[in-house]
Amino acid sequence: MSKPIRKIGSRRNERRIPKGVIHVQASFNNTIVTVTDVRGQVVSWSSAGACGFKGTKRSTPFAAQTAAENAIRTLMDQGMERAEVMISGPGPGRDTALRAIRRSGVLLSFVRDVTPMPHNGCRPPKKRRV
């Protein structure tokens, strides 16, 4: 006798998240926005490439703004009211992504820059000659 097949619904929409952490990783080529709960479980994510920007358009500030808005739109449906923001990377989309997060209506407890800074670690890549 086979077991009855259980129907697995979408658990993503069931969860209510009052507080979360928004991680913005802004590299020179792309901007990735990940939203987690306070334990670190990923709730939603978006990137400039996933929003439809390809090639050099991914590194623009407008692409970062679109990625931040897409990531936050899903968590607003899940009831997130407060958030912390962790920004890392030197990319051109970091300020625009933060501006889009501020405009979204989520109360921000703090904004922290977590860009890794070497204490004279690895040698940096050579300068480009264009």
UniProtKB/Swiss-Prot annotation:
Protein's name according to its UniProt entry: Small ribosomal subunit protein uS11c
Source organism: Cycas taitungensis
GO cellular component term of the entry, any: ribonucleoprotein complex
Family membership: Belongs to the universal ribosomal protein uS11 family.
Pfam hit, one: Ribosomal_S11
Gene3D superfamilies referenced in this protein's UniProt entry, alphabetically: Ribosomal protein S11 (3.30.420.80)
Keyword rRNA-binding: yes
Keywords attached to this entry: Chloroplast, Plastid, Ribonucleoprotein, Ribosomal protein, RNA-binding, rRNA-binding
Species lineage: Eukaryota, Viridiplantae, Streptophyta, Embryophyta, Tracheophyta
InterPro entries given in the database record: Ribosomal_uS11, Ribosomal_uS11_bac-type, Ribosomal_uS11_CS, Ribosomal_uS11_sf
Subcellular locations according to the entry: Plastid, Chloroplast
Domain of life: Eukaryota
